[in-house]
Amino acid sequence: MACRISELVIDCRDPRRLAAFWCQVLDFVVLGTEDDGAVEIGPREGFGGLQPTLVFSPSTEPRSGKLPLHIDVNVTDRDQDAELERLLALGARPADVGQTGEESWHCLADPEGNEFCLLRARLPA
């Protein structure tokens, strides 16, 4: 038997803001809020499905350097250019990680600067 990823915990300054952003990016819903201000989001069917939930945990610790982990998202219901425009309108911004301009993906940052990549459609909707 093996393990699978059930949730990703992301330390952040404003859990509600990031939860709202990522709910719109992934078409997730808020599944719960903890007393400490942490917000868990996930698929509409709730915890335990194929996709992991995301937990945005409040932190006042300063972040130093590049994070060793980032999220890749796949377009499911529109072309990559249309999705890029949608993500930018939601508050994402381009992130420069040394791209050449020939990549098939776009590197972006969420409202707190966490990098993520928008890939071309590779997964079915």
Predicted regions and their residues:
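N-terminal beta-strand motif that seeds the catalytic metal site of vicinal oxygen chelate
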Residues: 1-19, 69, 75, 122-125
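Vicinal oxygen chelate
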Residues: 3, 7, 32-33, 40-43, ...
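Short connector loops at helix/strand junctions that flank enzyme active sites
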Residues: 36, 49-51, 64-70
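Short, flexible, solvent-exposed loop/turn segments with mixed acidic/basic and small polar residues
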Residues: 58-63
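Mid-chain, well-packed structural core segment of small domains
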Residues: 64-85
